[in-house]
């Protein structure tokens, strides 16, 4: 098993069977010691965050597989904080697909002159480039085509899948009395050039509230999974 990439919140290994092993860490994104799923840097470490992230990811990927939504998920080992997944090629050098139900985070920081913080949004969809030095800028459909990162058809499929997946997650959280404010996903292409959901779905890449109270990732895991 060879280490091929050290990420902010996960280490990635190549397996002999051709698949990939993801090792979840206790590091989470944020700034100045405060967790923020929209940040592009590790802000702090929380004991148990890796295990909580894997448990949530396992739960949501199994739900998506039940709905025949394509993902890279193969299996997981909660005791070792690892998940085996199929190989996938990312779009360009990596994109993040964001669905927003409230005007918070970077959306509000960008558009605060035009909208009040917390204003409901109807599943607003946007894409950002994974580029720490550039601050993960947003990218338009036209720019994706111009740079040959994704085709127009792929863009529409990615938008449709993002809204479908996030809608399912939002409904599950609603059943627990929780409100999804925003969430970011990642997609790639499998060996047959089919778009599939990759990476993870956990409290570390979403903002969830109960009333006016923000629910931090570890507590969210317990509220969703018990």
How should these model regions be labeled?
Residues 149-181:
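A long amphipathic alpha-helix within ATP-dependent nucleotide-binding catalytic cores
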């Amino acid at each position: 098993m060879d280490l091929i990439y050290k990420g902010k919140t996960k280490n990635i290994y190549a397996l002999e069977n051709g698949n990939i092993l993801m090792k979840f860490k206790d590091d989470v994104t944020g700034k100045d010691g405060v967790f923020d799923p929209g940040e592009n840097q590790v802000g702090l470490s929380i004991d148990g965050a890796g295990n909580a992230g894997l448990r949530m990811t396992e739960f949501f990927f199994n739900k998506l597989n039940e709905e025949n939504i394509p993902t890279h998920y193969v299996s997981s080992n909660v005791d070792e904080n690892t998940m085996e997944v199929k190989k996938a090629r990312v779009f360009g050098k990596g994109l993040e697909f964001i669905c927003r139900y409230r005007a918070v985070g970077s959306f509000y920081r960008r558009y605060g002159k035009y909208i009040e913080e917390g204003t409901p949004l109807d599943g607003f969809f946007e894409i950002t480039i994974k580029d720490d030095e550039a601050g993960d800028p947003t990218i338009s459909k036209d720019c994706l085509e111009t740079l040959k990162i994704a085709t127009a058809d792929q863009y529409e499929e990615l938008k449709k899948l993002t809204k479908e997946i996030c809608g399912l997650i939002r409904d599950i959280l609603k059943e627990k009395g929780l409100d999804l404010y925003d969430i970011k996903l990642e997609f790639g292409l499998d060996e047959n050039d089919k778009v599939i959901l990759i990476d993870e779905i956990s409290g570390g890449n979403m903002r969830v509230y109960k009333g006016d109270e923000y629910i931090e990732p570890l507590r969210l895991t317990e509220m969703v999974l018990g």
